[in-house]
Amino acid sequence: MSARRPPRATPTPCPCGLGAEYDACCGRYHRGDAVPPNAEALMRSRYTAYVMGNMDWVRQTWHPSTCPADLLPDTATRWLGLSVKAHSQQDDTHAEVEFVARYKVGGRAWRLHERSRFVREPRAAGEPPVWLYVDGDMIGEAS
């Protein structure tokens, strides 16, 4: 009689679009095992957090000066994909990421095209600086 192997857990692909498994990609940031090394990685992790309804991560990575008080998950939105168009770092503490996020609401498809601004700053005394989302300019949103 042969022993049966326990079923393997099916790896969950990361919604951020890099093609990696969630746990090894954005999941490590969401769990606090790692810090996103640049603004693009942070932006991808924020997109993934929106997909998964992880509003704690979205709030934690939003600069306090611009974070809305009423940040709630949007259960009507179904996120479909992310494409990063550009990532530019102006200096050690400022960067921009241009992206297109595709989504559906009520069966209608939309595209969110944004150029987001990020800053890198310490979260607490003695801790290394982290990237934070500040704001963004909509380049277009069309069906």
UniProtKB/Swiss-Prot annotation:
Pfam family, one: YchJ_M-like
Similarity comment: family membership: Belongs to the UPF0225 family.
HAMAP family: UPF0225 (MF_00612)
Highest classification ranks of the organism: Bacteria, Pseudomonadati, Pseudomonadota, Betaproteobacteria, Burkholderiales
UniProt cross-references to PANTHER family, sorted A to Z: ADENYLATE CYCLASE-ASSOCIATED CAP C-TERMINAL DOMAIN-CONTAINING PROTEIN, UPF0225 PROTEIN SCO1677
Name of the protein: UPF0225 protein Reut_A0143
Cross-referenced SUPFAM superfamilies: NTF2-like
